[in-house]
Amino acid sequence: MNVRNNTKLITINALLLAIGVILHQITPVLGLPMQPDFAITMLFIIIILNDNFKITMVSGTLMGIFTAMTTKFPGGQLPNVVDKIFTALIVFLFIALIKKSNILGRLSVEKRNNILMAIVLPLGTLVSGILFLGTAKIIVGLPASFSILFLTVVVPSVALNTVIGLVLYRIVEKSLRRASLL
């Protein structure tokens, strides 16, 4: 890959990370000290668009640090970092497994990525929520039981992230196509 393409790639990823952090910061809480995690949605978009392990892990680490700085959960800094890094790894491996199995083999890249987003958004958000709650429970404790927080925060977040994530993905994809960056 030449320097010009690397610069474009770095710039696009930085913008997507920034959008994720801004969405994470401005998203209101759902009546509990937790919120839907649209930062993870942007992380999934980065993973699908780049299909690169190093970029995935760097983006997961950076998103973890950024969301730790903007978390509204008391003591949620370390759980955010752990959650984003491991979620990025799990989602990357899941996507690699799907691609290796050739289930979506004959589809165009655009259709394949749309299907991957539709699968990854709910599953990845679920993994992220479980990792966050589990890590928070071990490190700082939870304000309510794990199961109550799972049902009242993680499950609604899965639904919200899936719907809004698909919309965000289409916006990002169309923008990158119009700019001839995809």
Curated annotation (Swiss-Prot):
It comes from the Bacteria. The keyword RNA-binding does not apply. One of its GO terms (cellular component) is plasma membrane. Keywords: Amino-acid transport, Cell membrane, Membrane, Transmembrane, Transmembrane helix, Transport. It comes from Clostridium perfringens (strain 13 / Type A). The chain crosses the membrane at residues 10-32, 55-75, 119-141, 146-168. Probably involved in tryptophan uptake. Belongs to the vitamin uptake transporter (VUT/ECF) (TC 2.A.88) family. TrpP subfamily. This is Probable tryptophan transport protein. GO terms for biological process: amino acid transport. It is a multi-pass membrane protein. It is found in: Cell membrane. The keyword Transmembrane applies.
